[in-house]
Amino acid sequence: MALRYPMAVGLNKGHKVTKNVSKPRHSRRRGRLTKHTKFVRDMIREVCGFAPYERRAMELLKVSKDKRALKFIKKRVGTHIRAKRKREELSNVLAAMRKAAAKKD
C-alpha cells in the first residue's frame, strides 16, 4: 500500500511503493480483431452481401422494430449477447447507407 498521508495507522499506512504493473497475458487477446481479419471479413461482406436473416432483420430495423429484430436475430444466432452485437452491426450498416444516400443527393 502506498503511503498517502503521514499516518502510522489505518488503510494508508506503510512504505511508499511503486505498483508492479504486469503486461496482459497473451491468452487475453483471443477474439481481438486484427487488421488482416477485418480486411478479410470486409472483402467477404462485399462479395457475398448479407444472409437472408440479416436482410430481414435490417427490414425490421428500418421500421423501428428494434426489440422484434433482437428476438428474431437471437432465434437465429443463439445467444442474447451475439444477437445484440449483430443488431448493433446491422444498425450501423443502415446508418452508413442512410449517410451515403444523403451525401449522394
UniProtKB/Swiss-Prot annotation:
* Gene3D superfamilies from the UniProt entry: 60S ribosomal protein L36
Q: Which residues carry this modification: N6-acetyllysine?
A: 62
Coiled coil (residue ranges)? none
* PROSITE patterns xref list: RIBOSOMAL_L36E
Biological process annotations from GO: cytoplasmic translation; translation
Query: Any idea which GO molecular function terms this record carries?
Result: RNA binding; structural constituent of ribosome
Q: Which domain of life is it from?
A: Eukaryota
Q: Name one GO cellular component term.
A: cytosol
Disulfide topology: none
InterPro entries, per this entry?
Ribosomal_eL36, Ribosomal_eL36_sf
**Could you describe the subunit structure of this protein?**
Component of the large ribosomal subunit.
Q: Which family does it belong to?
A: Belongs to the eukaryotic ribosomal protein eL36 family.
What is the designated name of this protein?
Large ribosomal subunit protein eL36
Taxonomy-wise, where does this protein's organism fall, top ranks first?
Answer: Eukaryota, Metazoa, Chordata, Craniata, Vertebrata
Gene (UniProt): RPL36
